[in-house]
């Protein structure tokens, strides 16, 4: 009966139209998401987080779930502070150095957690891009590497960049957590490097930065040559692979031309051409450990959009404060067997 459904949903914390909540022992608690979550990604994450036998939460940072994917590879999962999709950071342990890919919001003692897992090894910290859920924890560390186009964006970080997570009364908007567990902002060294730059983690263990503009102007992926893994950043995502526009530039920052859909497509093609160098893909949100044969499907979707941007599968509109102005529109094209590409398109 409808009464029974209401009672069952109330008992589990599920609201109408929402997914079944994921059981969590994290210190953070979800208040709300900014937009509906993808059902397939949610099912994947629910199974992983509730049943994976490698999952561990360390006392030093109760905001992060740690999963072991390889002998030397750990996935660090954390809930997104602003209501967007929850995110991953990845920790590679090399023979002499470790590498942390992305820093999230820096919620909790991220540096202490990394030191705990690695046993205090020297750490190389790198960013895929500058967005808040990937780089706001950078100030937990002394030095961060990134693609050279990302440097001006990271230089814009400041002490008030977390303020938008709270309302005018200081209450958390999307995620319940202790505000004192956010980092105290400090300047850190930003080391911009070119496409193809190689990090040596000891011996013959090398990780290569690959410029993959599209989702962001200075976006980079990383290829672990030893474990044959592509860490793809946000250019690949089982929810929405968001990139730029077909015929306009949505960003106004430096190197903004690298957010265009054509640039995204060309960088996907570059990764397709290098599929013999990696076997698995680890995106920074939702599903990971994905086989590389997904890549041609992404390229096929990109080519279909560029050939006919009007042939989209669905479209969303977002209205601003001015109800008489045109809404912001995003168009979506399905990636065969995976998710969707979101793109901008100015008609006429």
Could you say what each language-model-derived stretch is?
Residues 51-63, 67-71, 98-100, 105-106, 143-304, ...:
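Metallo-beta-lactamase
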Residues 7-10:
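Short hydrophobic alpha-helical segments enriched in small aliphatic residues
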Residues 34-36, 105-200, 238, 293-294, ...:
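Active-site HxH/HxHxD metal-binding segment of metal-dependent hydrolases
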Residues 2, 13-18:
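N-terminal, intrinsically disordered, basic low-complexity segments enriched in Arg/Pro/Ser/Thr
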Residues 17-56, 266-348:
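Accessory terminal helices/loops
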Residues 60-116, 222-239:
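Conserved beta-strand hairpin/beta-sheet module of binuclear metal-dependent hydrolase folds
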Residues 17-96, 138:
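Zn-dependent metallo-beta-lactamase
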